[in-house]
């Protein structure tokens, strides 16, 4: 059995937590995040800590409590420090540029690709082949990064495409005659 739910989440100073039934709202310097938790989870807020436990009558109570603890911990980190995700563009002529909340990508297609960023996510391009995504919501950052990568996934022969900065692309050997 996982014991993730038994560890409390420490709420730092400057972070405001509101519990309204199963709806949790966490507000900090990087914004405000809201999440609705499963009915099997009971959350208590006391002494700048959030504690989690199962409600009676639910078979998966501890599992749902562990999930809720991990999600709320990510929310607290997001509103205090924020999350970043770095992407690299590998390939001749592959470029990225940010204009407002739109990322313009040149990925070898006959047309440029414009990707609209959701609210709360910012992007910057330190170089033409790097994209840095920043925001408070870990799930949204990961989804935007996955959407950008899906436009041109790294291919296995030369490794060209959009990849995460920490991703290792395994390359295949070319066909021999």
Curated annotation (Swiss-Prot):
InterPro entries: Ribosomal_uL6-like, Ribosomal_uL6-like_a/b-dom_sf, Ribosomal_uL6_a/b-dom, Ribosomal_uL6_bac-type, Ribosomal_uL6_CS. Keywords: Acetylation, Antibiotic resistance, Ribonucleoprotein, Ribosomal protein, RNA-binding, rRNA-binding. GO terms for molecular function: large ribosomal subunit rRNA binding; structural constituent of ribosome. It comes from the Bacteria. GO terms for biological process: cytoplasmic translation; response to antibiotic; ribosomal large subunit assembly. The keyword Transcription regulation does not apply. Disulfide bonds: none annotated. PROSITE patterns: RIBOSOMAL_L6_1. The modification N6-acetyllysine is found at residue 44. The keyword Amino-acid biosynthesis does not apply. It holds the Pfam family Ribosomal_L6. GO terms for cellular component: cytoplasm; cytosol; cytosolic large ribosomal subunit. NCBIfam families: L6_bact. This protein binds directly to at least 2 domains of the 23S ribosomal RNA, thus is important in its secondary structure. It is located near the subunit interface in the base of the L7/L12 stalk, and near the tRNA binding site of the peptidyltransferase center. Gentamicin-resistant mutations in this protein affect translation fidelity. Belongs to the universal ribosomal protein uL6 family. Part of the 50S ribosomal subunit. This is Large ribosomal subunit protein uL6. It comes from Escherichia coli (strain K12).
């Amino acid at each position: 059995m996982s014991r993730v739910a038994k560890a409390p989440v420490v709420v730092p100073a400057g972070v405001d937590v509101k519990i309204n039934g199963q709806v949790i709202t966490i507000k900090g310097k990087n914004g405000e995040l809201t999440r609705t938790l499963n009915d099997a989870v009971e959350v208590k807020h006391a002494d700048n800590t959030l504690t989690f436990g199962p409600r009676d009558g639910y078979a998966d109570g501890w599992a749902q409590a562990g999930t809720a603890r991990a999600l709320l911990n990510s929310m607290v980190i997001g509103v205090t420090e924020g999350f970043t995700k770095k992407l690299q563009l590998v390939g001749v002529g592959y470029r990225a540029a940010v204009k407002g909340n739109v990322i313009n990508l040149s990925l070898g297609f006959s047309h440029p690709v414009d990707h609209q960023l959701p609210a709360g996510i910012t992007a910057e391009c330190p170089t033409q082949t790097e994209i840095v995504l920043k925001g408070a919501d870990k799930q949204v950052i990961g989804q935007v990064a996955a959407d950008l990568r899906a436009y041109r996934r790294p291919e296995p022969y030369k490794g060209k495409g959009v990849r995460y900065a920490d991703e290792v692309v395994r390359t295949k050997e070319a066909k021999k005659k």
